[in-house]
Each structure stands twice: as C-alpha cells, then as structure tokens.
Regions:
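Short coil/turn motifs that N-cap or connect alpha-helices
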Residues: 56-57, 183-186, 217-221
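The canonical alpha-helical register within tetratricopeptide repeats
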Residues: 42, 49, 83, 174-177, ...
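Amphipathic alpha-helices of TPR/Sel1-like and other helical repeat/solenoid scaffolds
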Residues: 39-50, 137-141, 171-178
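Intrinsically disordered, low-complexity, charge-biased linker/tail regions
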Residues: 1-28, 32-35, 79-173, 203-206, ...
Length: 223
C-alpha cells in the first residue's frame, strides 16, 4: 500500500483523538474571546486532521464544518461539502448544486441533509433504505466514478452490508465496478474471493485470492 493509500485508509483512533482536540479548542475559543482567532485556528487544524485520518465518521466532518462556519469561512465550508459529496459518490449534477449557495447560511443544513439521506455508516445507510432505494443505489453504482479511494471504501462497505443481507448476486455484480476503478482494493478482492469459495466457485475464488497476494505479498491468503 503506497503512502497516499495509507493516508486515505480510515484510522478511527487518530480521527477521534484529533476531533477531541478540535472540540477542546472550540470551547477555549468560546471561553476567551481575546484568543478566539488563535484557538479556532488550532481547532480547524485538528478538525482537518480528524477528517484526514477517518473520513468514515460523520462527527469529524461535522466538527470541521462547524469550525469553518465559526471562522466565517464560507469558501472553506463549500470545499468541505464538495469533498464530502465526492466521498459519497455524488454525481456532477449534484456537485453543481453547491455553486452559488451561501454556505455560511445553509452549509451545515446541507451537511446534515447529506448524512440523513446518505449516511457514511453502512448500518445506518442500509436501515434507511426503502422502496426503490436499492434499485436506485444499483444504478448509481454502475455510473459513478470510484477512483477516489475514500468513495471506493465507503461503497465497498455498503456492498458488504448488502451481501450480508443476502443479496449475493448483486454484490458480485456491483463489486466489479468498484474494482474496475480501484483494482488495488485488496479488502474487496478478499471478500469477493471468500464469497466465491462459499458458493463453491473455486476458480473465481482463486483468481480473487491471486489479486490479494499480488497486492499484499505478506498475507497468506493461499494457506
């Protein structure tokens, strides 16, 4: 795994630690107006690190967005939302809707609306599905660009939740789209291989395990 991949792989403990630090500096900024600017600068730095280390935790995004608003940084808040939409796999039409919006007024509302309809947590996301949502998700997976590793990871976890719910054929179908955009996703190759093995599709299973072995030579997937 290269250095960029390491940075983009979720590290929950570090994310939580930096978010706690950001929260502490926000409290200090509120308590001491004379040092508000300095403390908010530290809060923003830690909030950015929290998102960097764990983009899968909605609290980290919320923390960063709140600090941006407290600093009256509408442009910065717009960039936070744009980055979040990329992670959520939103298409270009939805991204274009962010243009011309007063983000200081509605930025936090847009953030919360995104989490309600498109939670980063795979369990919350799956439990919110109703009606034609699964079909819409399927169509979405087939047309979106998943070259951003963060989006690839988020959608990979959603597909795993779909597989657990019994939609194995749908998992096998859609996972191909994610792997086509990001063939270095060893976790998805491993899950796909295990599924093929459970289904007694041995040739397909070994093809997946071969990919894992090439990506992570130290893993003894063939044993």
């Amino acid at each position: 795994m290269d250095s960029a991949s390491v940075l983009q792989h979720p590290r929950r403990n570090l994310g939580s630690r930096h978010r706690s630090q950001a929260d502490r500096f926000v409290k200090l900024a509120k308590q001491d107006p004379s040092r508000e600017s300095e403390n908010l600068a530290w809060a923003e730095q830690n909030a950015q690190q929290a998102v960097l280390f764990d983009f899968t935790d909605e609290r980290n995004w919320r923390c960063l967005a709140i600090v941006k608003k407290m600093r009256n940084d509408g442009e910065g808040l717009a960039l936070v939302l744009e980055d979040l939409f990329i992670v959520l796999g939103r298409d270009h039409v939805q991204l274009s809707q962010l243009k011309g919006v007063n983000h200081l007024d509605v930025g936090l509302e847009l953030l919360e609306a995104a989490f309600i309809t498109d939670s980063l947590d795979p369990e919350n996301w799956f439990s919110s599905l109703e009606g034609d949502d699964l079909e819409n998700f399927t169509n979405r997976c087939r047309r979106l660009d998943f070259t951003d590793q963060r989006a690839n990871i988020i959608y990979g976890r959603r597909l795993e939740r779909i597989r657990i719910a019994g939609h194995e054929d749908l998992f096998i179908d859609l996972v191909q789209h994610l792997l086509a955009h990001r063939p270095a996703n060893h976790e998805l190759w491993m899950e796909l291989g295990r599924l093929h093995e459970r289904r007694n599709e041995i040739d397909q299973a070994w093809l997946c395990y071969d990919h894992v072995q090439q990506l992570r030579p130290t893993d003894k997937v063939r044993d």
